[in-house]
Amino acid sequence: MRVLHVCSELYPILKTGGLADVTAALPPALASFGVDSRVLVPGFPAFINAIKDKQLLINIPSRFGAEEINIFLAKVPNTKIDIYVIDAPSLFARPGNPYADSSNQAYADNYLRFALLGWIAARISEGLDAKWKPEIVHSHDWHAGLVPAYIKASELASGKKAVKTVFTVHNLAYQGLFPMSVFAELDLPGIFLSMNGLEFYGQVSFMKAGLYFADKITTVSPTYAKEIQTYEQGCGLEGLLADRHNDLYGVLNGVDPQIWNPKKDSLIATNYSSTTVATGKAKCKLALQQMMGLAEKEDALLFGIVTRLTEQKGLNLLVEAIGEITSRGGQVVLLGSGDKALEEVFLAAAKKYPKSIAVQIGYDEEQAHRIIAGSDVIMVPSRFEPCGLTQLYGLTYGTLPLVHKVGGLADTVTDSSLENLADGTATGFVFDEFSVESLTLAIRRAFALYNRKTDWKKVRKTAMQQQVTWDSSAEKIYQIYKNLVRENN
């Protein structure tokens, strides 16, 4: 089975969030089911610079404002995965963030940049590469939302049955919304600009295009699949998603054990397993405390946070609750960037309590590994969270997740309540209500369990035994593919 994945990010070449981890890990995981995956990406500088031994597949005349378009075929470095890169310098050759300028303003021509991505995907589905034609095209998030629309448009124009499409929602809150006037530049049938198409409250929505035109929709956890059909979490698209509930699947993301594995992680102070976790984490914790200038206290309960500093991620709650940690002798290490006001608040807290709070603004993949390995608790207090990968990394490293009961967090972490401790299912700390009070109670439960060393070790062992790799999830995705291919034959 041949599957083309269409996305804007791919770890380790380009990453701004969890999307890159998923698009990198899913194709190799699917290979064990006989799926021949290839990936199509925009020619951002990171991709152009990373790929070696590329071959020119085709040159395409000017389109979507791009003066020159070359499609290259290469290998994703250090993998067996083939990658198509759209080299269109006038659209993609921009430094820094792939979506926004140095002032963090979204590029005004993003609709053209990602229209080209979708249009090229449709051409590949028709046989642009004479040696490889996909049976399924699987697009990811709003950047690739037009892929199913262009494929459907091609089917309508030719009268021939097109390849089947799958669209994955990684985060419904980011929708790719543009003024209605841009539709004329997208080269799509006029009938697509309607409620039964791209139109969304007087705007054009790339996300809605994917949701409406894809044959099947997946999102990244069972709970999130239910939540996005509700007014509270549907971001205005709950009606469409509810109408398509029979085509909507919630499939948890997984962890790539080649990258996130305490037994062989070269980025952490020492490797460890579930049997050596006590000594291994103690060494990682000391190394982290030394690196971040914290007091070197083995018995201090250390909370790690690796996140974007936004309201969605619950950081406004943490601002109010952080005193609960320091007043009890705990420590906090935070890595992230985002809202400038939140950055300043956390930097001020670190300046006031330099031996208890350490803050690093920005994102550093290596440091993320060190924080997750060296912390006792990893905090993910998100207001909403489609899946979340950080808590899965925490489970893998024996770093107990403290999470809000929402989305994929609710699906993957079991609270250390008395009954869950009794039956051996507890893996972390879960708070139900998105409030400072509820978060504070969860923090207090973490301290209480930490003081009961035998119980803490049991929960940590249970956490590390959780099956959070891609094996099970990849099989579910494969079954969706298989059913679609069967429909097309």
UniProtKB/Swiss-Prot annotation:
HAMAP family according to UniProt: Glycogen_synth
CDD domains documented for this protein: GT5_Glycogen_synthase_DULL1-like
E.C. no: 2.4.1.21
Pathway(s) this gene product operates in, as recorded in its UniProt entry: Glycan biosynthesis; glycogen biosynthesis
NCBIfam families per record: glgA, PRK00654.1-2
Family statement drawn from the similarity comment of this UniProt entry: Belongs to the glycosyltransferase 1 family. Bacterial/plant glycogen synthase subfamily.
A GO biological process held by the record: glycogen biosynthetic process
Function statement: Synthesizes alpha-1,4-glucan chains using ADP-glucose.
Organism: Francisella tularensis subsp. novicida (strain U112)
Reactions that this protein is recorded to catalyse: [(1->4)-alpha-D-glucosyl](n) + ADP-alpha-D-glucose = [(1->4)-alpha-D-glucosyl](n+1) + ADP + H(+)
SUPFAM superfamilies in alphabetical order: UDP-Glycosyltransferase/glycogen phosphorylase (SSF53756)
Identification of the protein by name: Glycogen synthase
Single annotated GO MF: alpha-1,4-glucan glucosyltransferase (ADP-glucose donor) activity
Binding site for ADP-alpha-D-glucose: 15
A single GO cellular-component term on record: cytosol
InterPro entries in the record: Glyco_trans_1, GS/SS, Starch_synth_cat_dom
